[in-house]
């Protein structure tokens, strides 16, 4: 709990003002296309069945502690969910677990879907889920 206290103390106005805890969908997909990011969809399995994102690895938030070994170190971890509430919780958890490049996806699912259009997909050559492992 002491580590969480320290983490929280560092999240002051300056921290949030810099925005370094966030990443845009455009930046995340750019890094992902170069193998420099792991896009982590933390929505529930049921939510993922309704709307699946082929470029993201799906690990529900409540399963993260048991599946942490599936998440690589050394690359940016772009955490996404329907909004940023769950992503923010997982972000803090990931930082405490040593994932210094964890980031919260700035956009919600609605905005992400609006970004991914044919020209965008072609430009960034998104990798399908099978290539994420």
Where in this protein do the model-derived segments appear?
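Rhodanese-like catalytic fold shared by cysteine-dependent sulfurtransferases
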Residues: 1-38, 45-76, 85-133
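Short, surface-exposed ligand- or partner-binding patches at beta-edge/loop junctions that are enriched
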Residues: 79-80
């Amino acid at each position: 709990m002491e580590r969480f206290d320290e983490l929280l103390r560092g999240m002051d106005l300056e921290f949030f003002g810099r925005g370094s805890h966030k990443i845009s969908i455009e930046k995340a997909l750019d890094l992902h296309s170069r193998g420099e990011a792991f896009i982590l969809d933390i929505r529930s399995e049921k939510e993922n069945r309704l709307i699946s994102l082929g470029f993201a690895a799906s690990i529900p938030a409540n399963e993260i502690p048991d599946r942490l070994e599936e998440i690589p170190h050394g690359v940016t971890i772009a955490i996404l969910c329907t909004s940023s509430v769950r992503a923010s919780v997982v972000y803090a958890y990931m930082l405490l677990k040593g994932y210094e490049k964890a980031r919260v996806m700035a956009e919600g699912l609605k905005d992400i879907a609006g970004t991914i259009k044919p020209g965008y997909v072609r430009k960034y050559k998104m990798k399908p889920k099978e290539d994420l492992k």
